[in-house]
Curated annotation (Swiss-Prot):
The keyword Transport does not apply. The gene is minC. This is Probable septum site-determining protein MinC. It comes from Vibrio campbellii (strain ATCC BAA-1116). InterPro entries: CAP/MinC_C, MinC, MinC_C_sf, MinC_N, Septum_form_inhib_MinC_C. Interacts with MinD and FtsZ. Pfam families: MinC_C, MinC_N. Cell division inhibitor that blocks the formation of polar Z ring septums. Rapidly oscillates between the poles of the cell to destabilize FtsZ filaments that have formed before they mature into polar Z rings. Prevents FtsZ polymerization. One of its GO terms (biological process) is division septum assembly. Belongs to the MinC family. Keywords: Cell cycle, Cell division, Septation.
Length: 220
């Protein structure tokens, strides 16, 4: 019995680059810097470009090439103000995208919490699909812990923690000692140099609200 291909709708969490102007060189330099800071996270990552705030025409061909040269995969453009801009982006090979509405399907049934009792070492990746992740040890630099739900680290976080990987906005990251290379919740992320010094090496909880991350220290 042969099976035909099946085309279904789905949703993914993608990084979105919000442009403030049409200076391509500045944008490419910014992306190259991000890749150099966290190459395993950003290299060959799909990228959507939001141009809603850009005044004036954009050289979409140069933009697409620059994004690819920086190590990303240009997926599409959102925020086009009119049909003419859409056509220019489309002619350069960009898909024209629009922000999705709130999902109407029922949320995925959460799986049991995944518990890791040993240190997560450099080069390792741990993923808790459809559930929360608890690490009862340290997460080393160069290691990556990912969960569709929340992440709890009962030790030092020196690597990367990515919660809400399937888009769960209510996900949290809790760790006993924050020294992370990168933290991310539902597609929004901070690199180490974006984490305020008052929270460094502290017990913290990271959450997301109004499309940005929030940090608070914990005393228990």
């Amino acid at each position: 019995m042969t099976h035909s291909p099946d085309l279904k709708g789905s949703s993914f969490t993608l990084s979105v680059l919000h442009l403030s102007d049409n200076e391509i060189a500045k944008t490419v330099e910014f992306l190259q810097e991000k890749v150099s800071q966290a190459p395993s996270f950003f290299a060959s990552a799909p990228l959507v470009i939001n141009i809603a705030k850009v005044e004036g025409d954009i050289d979409f061909t140069a933009l697409k090439q620059g994004i690819a040269d920086a190590g990303f995969i240009p997926v599409g453009v959102t925020g086009c103000k009119d049909k003419r801009v859409q056509n220019l982006a489309s002619e350069a090979g960009f898909a024209i995208m629009s922000a999705s509405k709130s999902p109407t399907q029922a949320p995925a049934k959460m799986a049991p919490t995944k518990i890791v009792r040993t240190p997560v070492r450099s080069g390792q990746q741990i993923y808790a699909k459809d559930g929360d992740l608890v690490v009862l040890a340290h997460v080393s630099a160069g290691a990556e812990v990912i969960a569709d739900g929340s992440i709890h680290i009962h030790g030092t976080l020196r690597g990367r923690a990515i919660a809400g990987a399937s888009g769960q906005q209510e996900a949290r990251i809790i760790c006993h000692d924050l020294q992370a290379e990168l933290v991310s919740i539902a597609g929004d992320y901070w690199l180490s140099d974006q984490i305020e010094s008052e929270y460094w090496q502290k017990k913290v909880m990271i959450s997301k609200a109004e499309e940005s991350l929030h940090l608070e220290t914990l005393t228990i």
